[in-house]
Amino acid sequence: MPTINQLVRKPRVSEVIKSKSPALENCPQRRGVCTRVYTTTPKKPNSALRKVAKVRLTNGFEVISYIGGEGHNLQEHSVVLIRGGRVKDLPGVRYHIVRGSLDLQGVKDRKQARSKYGAKRPKAA
């Protein structure tokens, strides 16, 4: 326990909390325009072609974000909505693109976890 004198000389410093998604600037989502849509490979031990997009946000940030789900209709100049959330096996990917919002369609024929992929409720047969 420090003495009062020690605290006067060197006060307590509170820890600075660093944001995990700085480009959002404390907003829940941000809109942006795709500048490049491509696939990339995950780090070991996984193997796949993960779909990602480079997005220029309305606040000027340029970020790499992940396109979840099977199949997508994104291309250059598509307007998308991004949210926070990293992809553990893709270094540098700290954002997700929201499915079923703006130019990105929801996942077709999705039956479970539909809200996460922007899929409408299927018609009862």
Swiss-Prot record:
Keyword line: Methylation, Ribonucleoprotein, Ribosomal protein, RNA-binding, rRNA-binding, tRNA-binding
TM stretches of this protein: none
Record function comment: With S4 and S5 plays an important role in translational accuracy.
Pfam families: Ribosom_S12_S23
Family: Belongs to the universal ribosomal protein uS12 family.
Coiled-coil blocks: none
Keyword rRNA-binding attached: yes
Gene3D superfamilies linked to this entry: Nucleic acid-binding proteins
GO terms of molecular function: rRNA binding; structural constituent of ribosome; tRNA binding
GO BP, sorted A to Z: translation
Protein name: Small ribosomal subunit protein uS12
